[in-house]
Design a protein with these regions (language model features):
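Structured soluble/peripheral alpha/beta segments that form catalytic or ligand/cofactor-binding pockets
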Residues: 1-313
Length: 313
């Protein structure tokens, strides 16, 4: 898939939105970037995550999971103050560096922890999708806006001294504004990537409504999602282990995605919710690739429901 040969049916995202934003002084306001990647041949997956609050406190984390590890890795650096003028063209915070290149096209980054070190160069496969491009905009309790994009990461991953060359799919998420985790009773954050197609959707359950944002990029056209029809299976812990979906977009196409989770973990982001993470191997219309599927659950509901999942789910 080539940026140059892709027709985008969605409005262009301003170049400035690839950089750090001036955050509003409202509760829970923050900016965050998540870089998800999968190395299935090594039975490893992970993500690098960095953020900054409205008060200028910035933190970083890296998570590595999968049967290819002796044990899971969750390395997180404490938040530290950063200058208001420091932006993502030269971001340096506690073990992480990030350097934007061409807006919405390239990003160089490093993460240096005790067990894991990553040196990566990200190149986008398609233009970013902004939630603000949807007719109803971005849910305001989850960001002023957010962009989602798929690409290729090259570089090196080092785990416990073991060196692994990177030339793999990466999913990049960037959001800014309020993040009130607990207002989603449940959500599904889904990414699927092959050399020929990219699919993303975010289905959110909040205030009695179900909201969906997302896109399909394939066959030279990027188009917004209009409907999703999915099915999935749980394991014995009520963690998703398969996920199959038929996605319909505004161009009238149906895209068939079939996923198996090969690495999983729980990421604790907020006291009200659990984030159940799953790195996947998959097919999009029969072509192989990888992706990520995150389920968010209200903790009270999940703790009650998990004992009934085998019987009723």
């Amino acid at each position: 898939m080539s940026l140059a040969n892709l027709r985008n049916d969605l409005p262009p995202v301003p170049e400035a939105d690839d950089n750090r934003h001036a955050l509003r002084d409202v509760p829970h306001c923050r900016e965050a970037v998540a870089l998800m990647f999968q190395v299935p041949e090594e039975q490893i997956a992970g993500f690098v995550y960095f953020w900054v609050t409205k008060d200028g406190m910035a933190g970083t984390a890296a998570v590595m999971i999968g049967d290819g590890l002796s044990s899971p890795i969750n390395e997180r650096f404490d938040e530290v103050p950063v200058p208001a003028g420091m932006d993502f063209h030269d971001w340096q915070v506690n073990g992480l560096t990030a350097t934007l290149g061409k807006p919405h096209q390239t990003l160089d980054f490093t993460f240096t922890g005790e067990r894991v070190q990553v040196t990566g160069h990200y190149e986008a496969m398609h233009p970013p999708y902004a939630f603000s491009s949807h007719k109803d905009g971005c849910p305001p309790y989850y960001a002023d806006d957010r962009t989602e994009q798929h690409g290729i990461v090259t570089g090196e991953l080092v785990i416990d001294g073991r060196r692994i060359a990177l030339n793999h799919f990466m999913q990049r998420d960037h959001s800014w504004g309020p993040r009130v985790w607990g207002l989603n009773q449940h959500y599904k954050w889904f990414h699927a990537t092959t050399a020929e197609a990219c699919v993303h959707f975010f289905e959110m359950h909040s205030f009695g409504k179900v909201l969906v944002r997302g896109y399909v990029a394939k066959d030279g056209v990027m188009s917004e999602i209009t409907a999703i029809d999915y099915d999935f299976e749980f394991d014995e812990t009520m963690h998703h282990k398969t996920f199959d979906v038929i996605v319909t977009d505004a161009a009238g196409r149906k895209t068939d995605v079939r996923c198996k989770v090969y690495a999983k973990t729980q990421f604790d982001a907020d006291p009200m919710i659990y984030l159940k993470e799953g790195a996947t191997t998959l097919t999009i219309d029969g072509t192989g690739g990888t992706g990520w599927c995150e389920f968010c659950w209200n903790r009270l509901y999940f703790d009650f429901a998990k004992d009934y999942a085998a019987l009723y789910a």
